[in-house]
A protein has these predicted regions:
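Extracytoplasmic/secreted envelope proteins and their assembly/folding machinery
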Residues: 8-9, 19, 23, 59, ...
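Exported/periplasmic cell-wall-interacting domains
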Residues: 110-179
């Protein structure tokens, strides 16, 4: 699989923080077994059904609703200028935890397909939530510092921990709106 590259990456993701922040909190630490370190307390995960997600391109934020009540917000990467996200309303079609990823590599006139294994460093992270619009969905990302910066192939990209939280609270009837 595409596992963590080192212990700091694993700890940062587990405690919902950027590696640089983990290092700043633990400047004189070596991150060896038995050593005490300081981490962020992410609190309890959301445990409420999400009936609607609204992706705001204006502020790079994903809003989660239960009925008319806003229950969570997430920083997100929503499309890019080269390949923008769609506009409109879609429905969750499928959900995959620890997905494989098909990559196509083109060299000259030769193109090869590769199937990349699951893991936190998979290009779609640890979650894929497919929409009823082909090739569009909600996904995790192995690059935590990229949220809020438009640089994706039209999908809605979140930190792996936020994508997992959404995965646990949506179903195939959940609406996803892009505005």
């Amino acid at each position: 699989g595409l596992y963590y590259q080192h212990i700091k990456e694993m700890l940062a993701e587990r405690f919902h923080m950027d590696i640089r922040y983990l290092e700043k909190l633990n400047q004189n630490k070596t991150f060896k077994a038995g050593e005490k370190i300081m981490v962020f307390n992410p609190g309890k995960s959301l445990q409420a059904p999400i009936s609607r997600l609204v992706a705001s391109k204006a502020d790079n934020t994903l809003y989660a609703y239960n009925g008319k009540n806003l229950i969570a917000t997430y920083p997100a990467v929503i499309g890019s200028t080269a390949i923008p996200s769609p506009t409109g309303s879609y429905t969750v079609k499928n959900q995959v935890k620890n997905p494989y990823y098909r990559a196509t590599v083109v060299e000259g006139t030769v193109s090869k397909n590769y199937m990349l294994p699951p893991g936190p460093n998979n290009p779609v992270g640890v979650v894929w939530i497919g929409l009823d619009k082909a090739n569009y969905g909600v996904q995790g990302t192995p690059v935590a510092k990229s949220y809020g910066k438009p640089a994706t192939h039209g999908t809605l990209r979140l930190s792996n921990w936020d994508a997992l939280e959404i995965y646990d609270n949506v179903n195939t009837n959940t609406t996803v709106e892009f505005k």
